Regions:
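Phosphoinositide-dependent membrane-docking surfaces
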Residues: 113-114, 122-139, 232-253
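Residue-level marker for the onset of beta-strands and adjacent loop->beta junctions
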Residues: 102, 120, 221, 228, ...
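N-terminal recruitment modules of adaptor/scaffold proteins
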Residues: 97, 109-114, 145-146, 150-238, ...
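Short, exposed beta-strand/loop patches in secreted or surface proteins that constitute
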Residues: 6-8, 105-108, 222-227, 246-249, ...
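Canonical hydrophobic alpha-helical transmembrane segment
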Residues: 36, 77-94
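N-terminal membrane-targeting/pre-transmembrane regions
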Residues: 1-74, 121, 127-194, 198-202
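Transmembrane-cytosolic junction motif
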Residues: 48-55, 89-112, 116-118
C-alpha cells in the first residue's frame, strides 16, 4: 500500500463517519505517573531533612499481617522512593505503549475505509478486502465479545488491526461489516452465477481458542472454504449444495454449524474464525435460496437475492 493513497470522492463515496482514538486513558495514565514520580521525589526529599535518630533495624507490620524488616530508616526511605519511582516509570511506559497503539484514526466512506496515521492517509476499498477478521482480546477474551477488527486485501499483505480503544468501536465495526458485505456480495454473486466457486479463509476453533491464550492474534493459519452453486467444500470434504439443509448460529458457543439432509455437520466452527464471516453467511443464504427456488422460473435469481 502506498503512502498518502487517497482517492477522489467519486471513488470513495460519501464520508459516513469519522472515528478517533480515546484520549482519557492516556491523560489519566500520564497524571498518575506524574503523581507517583512526584511522591518518589517528595519521599527522597524527606529522607534528606528528617532526623533519623536511632539508625537501627526497622520493622513494619501491614494491615494483612505481613511483616517487613529493614536494616535502618535510611533503607525504608530508599525502598519507598524506589518503589514509588518504579510504579511511576511503569505507568509512564504503559501510557507510551498505549499511545503507540492509539495513533491511528479512521474515516469510513461508502466505498472504503481511510486509515489516518499522523499525516499519512491510506485508503482501502471494501470491495478489495478479502479477509475481514473479528476477534476478542483483553479482559473479555473468554466471552467472545468482539473487541478487535482486522482487515487485509489478501493473504499477501499484513492485517491492519483496529482495537476497541477507538471511540464508538462497536458502531465502527458494525458499520464496516455492513458496508463490506454490500460492496463484496454483488461480485461474489456474479461469480457464482457464472459457475465459478468463491473462497473464504477459515481459522480452526482450536486455533481461535489458542490465540485467546497466547495473544498472537494476527499470525493465523487458514484453511479454504470453497462454495459454488453446486458444492460446498471444507478440509477436503465436498458435498452437494442440494444436500445442505440448516445453518445454525449459537450465541452461547459462538459456533456456526451447517448440517446436511441427514443432520450430519458439514461445518462446525467458531463463527468469527471464518474471515469475512458476514459475507460468507450472506453468500450461503443466496446459494441456499437459489437451490430452493431452482424449480421456479426466474430471469435472474442471483440478482433478485442480492437485492
Amino acid at each position: 500500500m502506498q503512502p498518502n493513497n487517497f482517492h477522489t470522492s467519486s471513488d470513495t463515496g460519501e464520508l459516513i463517519a469519522t472515528f478517533r482514538q480515546g484520549k482519557a486513558f492516556l491523560i489519566f495514565g500520564l497524571i498518575l505517573a506524574v503523581v507517583f514520580l512526584g511522591l518518589a521525589a517528595f519521599v527522597f526529599y524527606l529522607s534528606t531533612i528528617v532526623p533519623m535518630g536511632d539508625n537501627g533495624p526497622v520493622t513494619l507490620h501491614t494491615s494483612r499481617g505481613m511483616t517487613m524488616n529493614f536494616a535502618s530508616q535510611d533503607v525504608v526511605f530508599s525502598f519507598t522512593t524506589g518503589l514509588l519511582a518504579l510504579i511511576g516509570l511503569c505507568l509512564l511506559g504503559t501510557t507510551a505503549w498505549h499511545k503507540k497503539l492509539r495513533n491511528t484514526d479512521y474515516e469510513v466512506y461508502g466505498n472504503g475505509i481511510v486509515r489516518i496515521t499522523k499525516d499519512q492517509r491510506d485508503y482501502t476499498a471494501f470491495a478489495e478486502i478479502e479477509d475481514l477478521y473479528l476477534f476478542s482480546s483483553g479482559q473479555t477474551v473468554l466471552t467472545g465479545l468482539i473487541t478487535n477488527l482486522a482487515y487485509r486485501r489478501n493473504a499477501s499483505e499484513p492485517f491492519h488491526r483496529v482495537i476497541d480503544t477507538l471511540k464508538d468501536f462497536q458502531a465502527f465495526q458494525e458499520l464496516v461489516r455492513d458496508l463490506h458485505v454490500r460492496a463484496r456480495l454483488p461480485a461474489v454473486a456474479e461469480a457464482l452465477e457464472a459457475g465459478q466457486s468463491v473462497t473464504f479463509n477459515c481459522i480452526s476453533s482450536k486455533q481461535v481458542w489458542g490465540k485467546r491464550v497466547t495473544g498472537s492474534f494476527l499470525k493465523v493459519t487458514t484453511a479454504p472454504i470453497l462454495l459454488s452453486r453446486d458444492f460446498f467444500e471444507y478440509q477436503g470434504n465436498r458435498v452437494p449444495v442440494s444436500s445442505l439443509r440448516t445453518v445454525d448460529l449459537n450465541a452461547w458457543t459462538e459456533n456456526v454449524v451447517i448440517k446436511d439432509e441427514n443432520g450430519k455437520p458439514v461445518l462446525s466452527t467458531i463463527a468469527t474464525g471464518i474471515l469475512s464471516h458476514d459475507l460468507f453467511l450472506s453468500t450461503l443464504d443466496v446459494v441456499l435460496a437459489v437451490e430452493e427456488q431452482a424449480r421456479k422460473p426466474a430471469a435472474n435469481v442471483f440478482e433478485m437475492n442480492v437485492r
